Amino acid sequence: MAKDKFERTKPHVNVGTIGHIDHGKTTTTGAILAVQAAKGLAKAKGYSDIAKGGTVRDATKTVTIAVAHVEYESENRHYAHIDCPGHADFVKNMITGAAQMDGAILVVSAADGPMPQTKEHVLLGRQVGVPYIVVYLNKCDLVDDEELLELVELEVRELLSKYDYPGDDVPVVRGSSLPAYNNPSDPEASKCITELMEALDSHIPEPTREDDKPFLMAIEDVFSIEGRGTVATGRIERGVVKVGEEVEIIGLGPNSTKTTCTGVEMFRKEMNEGRSGDNVGCLLRGVKREDIQRGQVLAKPGSITPHTKFEAEVYCLSKDEGGRHTPFFSGYRPQFYFRTTDVTGTANLVGADMCMPGDNVKVEVELHKPIAMDDGVRFAIREGGRTVGSGVVTKILE
């Protein structure tokens, strides 16, 4: 367990890198760490450290899977940064990752321009509620034509506007991550990263934390620590959890379990409490490793209940957005992805005979397992591992 106390001196913001595979997301993350480390504001990490989390090789490259968490500071803020996987097959991680962002750095290779996954990630960002995007045009050193850069920038701005981001006002930083990663102390090489940090500080407002609401954390991972007990990790969605407080484990079964949180840690440092927006591990008294799983939530007792039936407003992705090619009808049985897990359920259309790709419809859903939910919670609709729609719970039925 952690030893150092976590110091809270600067406001805390969650960001992450999104964008097409091989456009340089992980290198950009490494460059930020290297440049900030040279200023004493971060610990540098190598590319392979950031890309770890199970790397699967395709024919030529190492495709980054899983979500890497790193931390660094700017002059004004403390950032927790996730390096989101860019590969279409790993959209599931993208969903768990993107749900954790106050803002995202959209990395686009200036040599290639926006690609299918660039679009997919912006769309996903819009769906899972990433409120702000800052654009980083990478590999500008490979493009010697100023007009081409202008063109790529225009293309990215149009793409953002299409998905309801303020495309005309979004900061676009031009740079090259590899030289900055290799020479972090060289002012010329690192200038683009300095500009990127300034853009993050100025364009992503300090998030209004939901500290005053009742505590809720979606469980992402569970592990046992010898002699200490069971730890559940995740991002605190709302509220505050203090060491010694009672919490409830809810979801994926009819019964909820009450337990006491006997320790909170963040980035291997012990804390007296965890607040909304923090990625923490909670040590739980008397809970066995097998009694708790990803997809459940930890919450203030009595503040949220598990449900299986609800009404929702659903958007079915169009074929061009990577959605279904055919309509669905009442009795449709996809997976519903809530917070950190997929649950199978049945959707029945309300006031419509069918839902075409690209349509918005009202549905009644019955899940096979109960999920902790309240009105306004968002979910993705998935088939065989790909996202075909997104929705928001409008009314809980039972």
Curated annotation (Swiss-Prot):
CDD domains hit by this protein: EF_Tu (cd01884), EFTU_II (cd03697), EFTU_III (cd03707)
Region: G2, residue numbers: 60-64
Region (G1): 19-26
Cellular compartments per GO CC: cytoplasm
Listed InterPro entries: EF-Tu_GTP-bd, EF-Tu_GTPase, EFTu-like_2, EFTU_2, P-loop_NTPase, Small_GTP-bd, T_Tr_GTP-bd_dom, Transl_B-barrel_sf
Keyword Hydrolase: yes
Residues annotated for Mg(2+) binding in this entry: 26
Primary residence: cytoplasm
Subcellular location: Cytoplasm
Family per similarity comment: Belongs to the TRAFAC class translation factor GTPase superfamily. Classic translation factor GTPase family. EF-Tu/EF-1A subfamily.
Full protein name: Elongation factor Tu
Taxonomic lineage: Bacteria, Pseudomonadati, Planctomycetota, Planctomycetia, Pirellulales
Gene designation per UniProt: tuf
